[in-house]
Amino acid sequence: MSWSGLLRGLSMSLNYGLALAPRPWGTRPMATLNQLHRRGPPKFPPSKPGPTEGRPQLKGVVLRTFIRKPKKPNSANRKCCRVRLSTGREAVCFIPGEGHNLQEHHVVLVQGGRTQDLPGVKLKVVRGKYDCGHVQKKK
């Protein structure tokens, strides 16, 4: 077998191996000029809005309060509430701090920011605004 055949096989295996290599999140493989010519410029899907739909905070009404258990390595009882937002959507919100006075029909201010160990909880209640009191000072 000739050297050129070996080199061609080596370069093809390297290219094939690089194509299968894991890529960091959010990156796409680059298109060749021929692919760009045939397909046109890449069309990316529009990004989905977050739970607050691009707003920093939203007002909402508490539907019910409950306790959730966090994911595997952590153990606690995380206080959460189901809130009907001013946009009409319902969402689960985390209540930060120790102790709270929230009950059904209380009006709260909600901001984005997920709770890492609670799956599906992407909003937090703002303490000290509307019907949600400040965190009490320890005695």
Swiss-Prot record:
Component of the mitochondrial ribosome small subunit (28S) which comprises a 12S rRNA and about 30 distinct proteins. It comes from the Eukaryota. One of its GO terms (cellular component) is ribosome. Its main location: mitochondrion. Residues 37-57 are annotated as: Disordered. SUPFAM superfamilies: Nucleic acid-binding proteins (SSF50249). Gene3D superfamilies: Nucleic acid-binding proteins. Residues 1-29 form a transit peptide. GO terms for biological process: mitochondrial translation; translation. This is Small ribosomal subunit protein uS12m. PANTHER family: 30S RIBOSOMAL PROTEIN S12 FAMILY MEMBER. Pfam families: Ribosom_S12_S23 (PF00164). Belongs to the universal ribosomal protein uS12 family. InterPro entries: NA-bd_OB-fold, Ribosomal_uS12, Ribosomal_uS12_bac. It is found in: Mitochondrion. Keywords: Mitochondrion, Ribonucleoprotein, Ribosomal protein, Transit peptide. One of its GO terms (molecular function) is structural constituent of ribosome. The keyword Amino-acid biosynthesis does not apply.
